[in-house]
Amino acid sequence: MIFNIKPELEEKLDELIELFSTMNPTEALEQISFLIFLKRLEEEDNKKANDALLEEKDFDSIFKDNEGCQWSKWANMSADAIIKQVRDVVFPFIRTLHDESFIYAKYLKNATFNIENPQTLVQAVKIINLEELNKKDSFTDGLIYKYLLSRLNIEGQNKQYKTPDHIVHLMIELVKPTVDDSICDPTCATGNFLEACYQHILKQNSSPEFIKKDEYGNVYDLKGDKLENKWDKFNKNTFYGFNVSQSMTRVAIMNLMMHGLQNPNIQQIDTLSRQYEEANKYSLIICNPPFNNKVNTSDIRTDFTVTAKKSIYYYLELIFNLLTIGGRCAVIVPEGIAFGIKKNEKKVKELLMNYARLDAVIKLHLKIFQPFGKDISTNILVFTKGEPTEKVWFYEMESDGYTIDKKRTKIDGWGDIPDIIEKFNKRDIEDFSDRTKKCFFVTFEEIKKENYDLSFNKYKIIRYEEINFGDPKELIQKIINFEEQILNTSKEVEKLLNGERENNA
């Protein structure tokens, strides 16, 4: 079981996924999402009607004059009837919706219906109607969507590395997002980082009585009651993400909405292109950008100073440009950025150390992206724009709480992560001068002398313990004595074997 969900829910979701096994994973997820959203649209409409009744206000249903498009009206139709109703009536109707007050409606208006088999639709509707999938809370919806994303390996299908949830948690704890932040992921993929930031802020702003855990340790029922008059800003002007792919843009929107974020600002645009002109806008950026994507240099932003073949160099400069003064960032980069001394590698590091305060370099182990991706050496860089670097805190993660192999079996699920967070928060008050340990400080001047090398092993001091084997003459005599013992034992064994042969004769 993954994501600590109940076995009965996992079983039903697996059945749902199997129904769409002939589709590519992204298309399958979209079709499942559209069906779930159609059900939620009627539920949202019913809630608004009840609220209006209680407040003695007039209310026009979004389904007015189109009642046959309500989930409850067609969900129990026969196979032939349901496929015609959904294809020929429901989907043409939802594409005409323009009521921005309905959070599900505006993301259904561009939906396309691609289910051709009537039985697939009938069985999918039955599963979506099950009690296990209808707790009517963002916690359950979020778990459902997170499970679907993982089982369908959406990021892998789109040639992206899924950042494990516990590594996302680590990065969030290092930059501490707040409701006052403007948070961006310029390469957001499924929106995983933004969703985690949303949950973190919600938890930080929920009173203890509203922070509950189920039997698997999942936190739920977060009310965010301390947000008070900041709710509107939190929902509308806090989270921003961008994707090159239209399908991934839609997936990210659905993911965030299923987790409870009502108005995610997710756009389809290449943030390296000239069409994307934002700068100095965000107070927090958290991401895992593509390392080796090809870059269309003929359509690249004009404010870049690097000229490279690999996309990671452009993304690092982009992140710097997007941050406001005092803005923070946690970003995953390949090891080559850390130790590289070529022109572009050095230029990017000079930028992050001369015009930002590079707070930390955290070395991750090779298997961190298994089982979702390949073995790759990476680091987390944490920096703050606008202050020059005086010293950099290095940490080598030896364990992340899972076995370091392709199976990635859970040990405790955390490994060094709590220690990293604790020591990072105490780095200005504790002594980190001992470079024989797994974390230490290195001054900017020393790093500069080493051509801006940011690799952990460059500064780690390894002390080899001296082993005293004693007097060499005595050691040789011991070896001779040992060999004599072996020889004598061999002769005794030979005598015994010869004796057995004579007796048998």
Language-model region placement:
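Conserved Class I SAM-dependent methyltransferase catalytic core
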Residues: 28, 244-249, 309-382
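Conserved S-adenosyl-L-methionine
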Residues: 160-287, 292-294, 303, 307-309, ...
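A generic structural signal for well-ordered coil/turn residues at beta-strand boundaries
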Residues: 281, 285, 376-377, 388-391, ...
